[in-house]
């Protein structure tokens, strides 16, 4: 069921056709499933267990929703794209159409946990977005944010997706200033991808422009199996904060009482 809060120009954040056209491919890609498992582990590690309610902000293709539903969390997905919400809608799934650049209606539910995974890099005002989300979080709620990292890796792939920026730990921490959330930890993820992305960036500097689907194309087997194994290998290291670099950064923050 889709509830309506507000609408806005979805294509300004990420081309809506890209979301729709790549749904099947994303749901099979190891990166999205590994990220969802990491977010689930973070919720558990910070004391957020069912029946605590979760809001997945920028739920997109629904990979996080499936992971949390399988873990028996009552979860709601929020996205600006009506088209993608209609594609992932299920009779017992709770979805909200809303524009993060606008305020939210009164009388809404308060959530114990919130996911904001690879969202704020699409928005001009990252801090303002987090600040607007604060009233949706109950006191002590956990907010998990992920972003693409290392500005020197900014490439055509970022442009295609509608990314405004890539982050460093300090710039990610600054996005929480004055928002009502206190950052508890920031850590790297995807360290094994960094040299690959560096090579890809150099290779495609003068190449023919590519599409989002081109970048999502998985290499032949057994490469996808190897990718899954690398994410499993890195999972605990990322959670422990022992990685020294990565293609992504995660932040875990707590709503002030």
Walk through the language-model features, giving the residues of each.
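Conserved N-terminal segment of class I S-adenosyl-L-methionine
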Residues: 1-117, 127-130, 216-220, 224, ...
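Short, glycine-/aromatic-enriched active-site segment of Class I SAM-dependent methyltransferases
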Residues: 23-25, 143-165, 169-174
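Feature marks short, surface-exposed loop/turn motifs that line or immediately flank catalytic pockets
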Residues: 84, 104, 151-153, 192-193
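A short His-aromatic
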Residues: 118, 122
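A short glycine-rich, Lys/Arg-flanked "PGG" loop and its adjoining helix->strand segment in the class I
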Residues: 127-142
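Conserved S-adenosyl-L-methionine
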Residues: 181-191
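C-terminal helical/coil "lid" or tail adjacent to the Rossmann-like core of SAM-dependent
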Residues: 193-228
């Amino acid at each position: 069921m889709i509830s309506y809060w507000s609408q806005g120009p979805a294509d300004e954040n990420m081309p809506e056709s890209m979301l729709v056209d790549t749904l099947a491919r994303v749901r099979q890609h190891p990166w999205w499933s590994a990220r969802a498992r990491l977010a689930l582990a973070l919720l558990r590690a910070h004391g957020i267990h069912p029946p605590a309610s979760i809001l997945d902000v920028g739920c997109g293709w629904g990979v996080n929703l499936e992971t949390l539903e399988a873990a028996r969390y009552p979860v709601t997905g929020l996205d600006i794209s009506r088209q993608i919400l209609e594609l992932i809608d299920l009779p017992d799934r709770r979805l909200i159409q809303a524009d993060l650049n606008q305020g939210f209606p009164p009388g809404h539910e308060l959530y114990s946990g919130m996911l904001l995974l690879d969202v704020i890099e699409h928005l001009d005002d990252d801090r303002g977005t987090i600040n607007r989300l604060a009233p949706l979080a109950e006191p002590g709620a956990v907010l998990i944010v992920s972003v693409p990292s290392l500005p020197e890796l900014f490439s055509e792939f970022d442009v295609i997706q509608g990314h405004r920026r890539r982050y460093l730990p300090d710039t990610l921490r600054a996005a929480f200033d004055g928002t009502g959330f206190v950052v508890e930890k920031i850590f790297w993820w995807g360290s094994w991808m960094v040299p690959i992305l560096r090579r890809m960036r150099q290779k495609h500097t003068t190449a023919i422009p590519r599409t989002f689907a081109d970048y999502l194309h998985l290499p032949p087997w057994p490469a996808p199996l190897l990718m899954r194994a690398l994410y499993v290998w890195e999972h605990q290291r990322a959670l422990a904060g022992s990685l020294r670099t990565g293609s992504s950064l995660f932040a875990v923050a707590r709503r002030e009482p």
